[in-house]
C-alpha cells in the first residue's frame, strides 16, 4: 500500500538557476581522513545542462590536491525557510589545471522548501538510518571565540556543514544555526546523514559567508560535533524562533506563506527530531575564487 509523505525534493531542472549561476557554491571532500569544505566557483561545461553537464570547479590556492577524489559540490540560496534551496552533485574530481577540476555528476539531489508537496512512497522504502546519540548535557572542551568567528556567526544566516561517514564519504548541507553557551546549534532529523556521520566521525568543517553574491569573503571553521536526540534546549529554540521567524523582516515572509504552515508541520512531524552541537576549534579567513 502506498504511503503519502511530504517531500522537499524536486527535479534538478527546477533549480536550473542554481546550476547556471549559483549565488554561492562550496565543495566538500575527505582529504586523507580529514573533512574539507572550500568555497568554489562553478561553471557548466558546454552545452550547458543543469542536470547532466560536468561542473568545472575552481578552488582557492593552497589546498590539498583533490584529483581523483570523490567530492560533493553544493549550491544554495535563500536565508528564509520558504526560499531555502539546494542543488548538490556527487562525483569524482579530475584535474584540469591549477586549482581547477572537472566533476561529472554521478548523483544529483535538489530540494526546495518552498515547494513542499505530498507524494506517494512505494512499498519497501528503506528503514531510516539509526545513529547513536550523545547526552544533552555531555561535557566537551571549551569553545573557541576568535573575533572573526563571532562576526561570521552574527552576520551569517545559513552555514554549510560538512561531515564524513565512517567510510570517508563526504557530505555537505546548508543549515540554519544559532549560538548558545559558546557553541553552535543546528536542528535536523534524527535519521539524517549529518547525524549518522557525526556519530561515526565527530570532526566537522563549517563554511560561513557568501550569502551576498558580491561578497567573496569566507570563514572556514573546523571543530567537532555531537548529535543529540530531540529538540534543543528552550533557550536555543527561542533564539531560532526569533532569528528566523519573528524578526519583522522574516515574520512578514512567514505570514505570506501562512497557508503552507500546516504542510510544513506535517513535514517536520514525519521524522524524529535531533540537533547538532558544534564546538569550534579553529577559524581561518579565506576568499572564494
What are these regions (language model features)?
Residues 21-23, 65-72, 155, 198-204:
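Short coil-to-beta transition motif at edge beta-strands of beta-rich domains
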Residues 2-28, 131-170:
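Short, conserved active-site entrance elements at the starts or edges of catalytic domains
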Residues 196-200, 205-219, 226:
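Helix-adjacent hinge/juxtasegments
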Residues 60, 85, 170, 186-188, ...:
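Short histidine-centered beta-strand/loop micro-motifs
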Residues 16-62, 156-190, 205-209, 217-220:
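Short beta-strand segments
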Residues 193:
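Short alpha-helical
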Residues 2-4, 9, 68-144, 216-289:
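Charged, gly/pro-rich active-site loop segments
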Residues 150-151, 196, 266-268:
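Short secondary-structure boundary/capping segments
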Amino acid at each position: 500500500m502506498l504511503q503519502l509523505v511530504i517531500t522537499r525534493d524536486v527535479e534538478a531542472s527546477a533549480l536550473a538557476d542554481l546550476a547556471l549561476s549559483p549565488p554561492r557554491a562550496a565543495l566538500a571532500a575527505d582529504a586523507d581522513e580529514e573533512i574539507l569544505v572550500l568555497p568554489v566557483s562553478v561553471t557548466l561545461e558546454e552545452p550547458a545542462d543543469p542536470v547532466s553537464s560536468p561542473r568545472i570547479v575552481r578552488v582557492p590556492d593552497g589546498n590539498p590536491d583533490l584529483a581523483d577524489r570523490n567530492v560533493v559540490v553544493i549550491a544554495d540560496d535563500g536565508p528564509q525557510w520558504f526560499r531555502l534551496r539546494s542543488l548538490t552533485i556527487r562525483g569524482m574530481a579530475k584535474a584540469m589545471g591549477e586549482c581547477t577540476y572537472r566533476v561529472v555528476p554521478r548523483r544529483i539531489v535538489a530540494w526546495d522548501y518552498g515547494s513542499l508537496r505530498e507524494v506517494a512512497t512505494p512499498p519497501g522504502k528503506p528503514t531510516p538510518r539509526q545513529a547513536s546519540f550523545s547526552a544533552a548535557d555531555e561535557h566537551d572542551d571549551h569553545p573557541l571565540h576568535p573575533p572573526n568567528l563571532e562576526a561570521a556567526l552574527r552576520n551569517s544566516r545559513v552555514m554549510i556543514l560538512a561531515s564524513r561517514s565512517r567510510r570517508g564519504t563526504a557530505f555537505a548541507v546548508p543549515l540554519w544555526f544559532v549560538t548558545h553557551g559558546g557553541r553552535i546549534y543546528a536542528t535536523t532529523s534524527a535519521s539524517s546523514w549529518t547525524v549518522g556521520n557525526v556519530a561515526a566521525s565527530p570532526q566537522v568543517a563549517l563554511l560561513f559567508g557568501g550569502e551576498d553574491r558580491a561578497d567573496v569573503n569566507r570563514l572556514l571553521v573546523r571543530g567537532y560535533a555531537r548529535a543529540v536526540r530531540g529538540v534543543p534546549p528552550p533557550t536555543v529554540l527561542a533564539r531560532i524562533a526569533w532569528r528566523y521567524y519573528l524578526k519583522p523582516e522574516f515574520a512578514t515572509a512567514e505570514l505570506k506563506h501562512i497557508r503552507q504552515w500546516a504542510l510544513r508541520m506535517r513535514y517536520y512531524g514525519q521524522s524524529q527530531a535531533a540537533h547538532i552541537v558544534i564546538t569550534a576549534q579553529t577559524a581561518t579567513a579565506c576568499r572564494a575564487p
